[in-house]
A protein has these predicted regions:
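SAM-dependent Rossmann-like transferase core, predominantly class I methyltransferases
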Residues: 56-125
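N-terminal auxiliary segments of SAM/dcSAM-dependent transferases
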Residues: 1-73
Length: 125
């Protein structure tokens, strides 16, 4: 099966079950070891059996066992940085990224030219 058909097939299943289609894309990129651009260039290529087998194992963890994609692939992006994650740590939330961004915008207004200490309390592992 071609990458484009395979991806659409699994994204449709995820969507029907109320899951994010973008998560399916992330899992395919992870197992195929491709960037988004590389995958786009290979959309008409046949998917390798080993990639599809590993991908389907990951998709089942996501759709059937409700395991977050970040735990399956072992990393999460936060404020432009990739962090290793597993069951022992919390996955960074988009709302926390917004908080960091807001604080950085306010920094110059209140603390320009001053050294400050920042304490992160109760926001994760």
């Amino acid at each position: 099966m071609k990458y484009k058909d395979y991806l659409k097939y699994w994204q449709d299943i995820a969507s029907e079950k109320g899951y994010e289609e973008s998560a399916i894309l992330l899992l395919l990129l992870y197992e195929a070891k491709l960037t988004s651009s590389e995958l786009y260039m290979k959309m008409d290529d046949e998917i390798d059996k080993k990639i599809s087998d590993n991908f389907e194992t990951d998709v089942k963890k996501y759709l059937d066992d409700n395991i977050p994609v970040q735990y399956i692939i072992g990393e999460a992006c936060f404020y432009g940085y990739d962090f290793n994650v597993n069951n022992d740590v919390l996955i960074p939330r988009p709302e926390t990224e917004e908080l960091v961004e807001n604080i950085l915008f306010l920094y110059d207004d209140y603390f320009k030219g001053k050294d400050i200490d920042v304490v992160d309390i109760g926001t994760g592992s």
